[in-house]
Amino acid sequence: MSIVKKIEIDGKEVAFKASAAIPRIYRLKFQRDIYKDLRSLEKSIGDGDEENSNLDLFSLEMFENIAYIMAKHADGSIPDTPEEWLDDFNTFSIYQVLPQLIELWGLNVQTDVEAKKKLRNTEREMTTPLFLLRCVQLGLSMADLELLSIGLINDMYSESRNDDYNYAEIANQDDYDRF
């Protein structure tokens, strides 16, 4: 399930898409964890007051990368690099766009959680032994655990054990190559 939102940037309506694929696409493109980066940006921007924020150049680049991935996910015709995409704008304010992207991401995560609750086969409490058992059942190595989030591992386990997922499309190599 995904959510699309249009945000006005520099007088243009830009579509942004949040879905379960975003963390993977972001990690593949930038070798970073989008959850950590969004939390970091949210802390840095504070209450949206430009004068009292803790934004540095690295934070700005993280924001631009997140915005780019979500825009590219919504519109495949967007250029293949964040730099080319950003060239389309005269101004691109983190203080106007980031809060809306965080809200969009929050709506998507909330929708995913509600959908997963409906698909969950068990109401067992997630404990460390249960989590490790699931990792073993999925055949994950310690190196895999370093790269994957707990949520992604739980998603992988749910999908491997549940036939109720009805996907309209199956991703192919071309889909991954676009990102």
Please provide the spans of the model-predicted regions.
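Covalent nucleotidyltransferase core used to form phosphodiester bonds in nucleic acids
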Residues: 24-30
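Charged interaction scaffolds used for protein-protein
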Residues: 1-13, 20, 32-57, 61, ...
